[in-house]
Structure formats: C-alpha cells, structure tokens
C-alpha cells in the first residue's frame, strides 16, 4: 500500500 505516505495518509488506506 502507500507505505511511503505519512501516517495521517495511511489512515485513509483503512
């Protein structure tokens, strides 16, 4: 997934 994105962006992946 978007592992290169910051934590705040990874939350959207959920």
From Swiss-Prot:
GO biological process terms, semicolon-separated: defense response
RNA-binding found in the keyword field: no
Main location: secreted
Coiled-coil ranges (or none): none
A cellular-component GO term for this protein: extracellular region
PTM characteristics: Contains 8 disulfide bonds.
Domain of life: Eukaryota
Expressing tissues: Expressed by the venom gland.
Keyword field contains Secreted: yes
Key words, A-Z: Disulfide bond, Secreted, Toxin
Subcellular location(s) per record: Secreted
GO molecular function, one term: toxin activity
Family named by the database record: Belongs to the CRISP family.
Note: Not toxic when administered to crickets at doses up to 5 nmol/g.
Name used for this protein in its record: Cysteine-rich venom protein 23
Record organism: Naja haje haje (Egyptian cobra)
């Amino acid at each position: 997934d978007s592992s290169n994105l910051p934590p705040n962006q990874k939350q959207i992946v959920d």
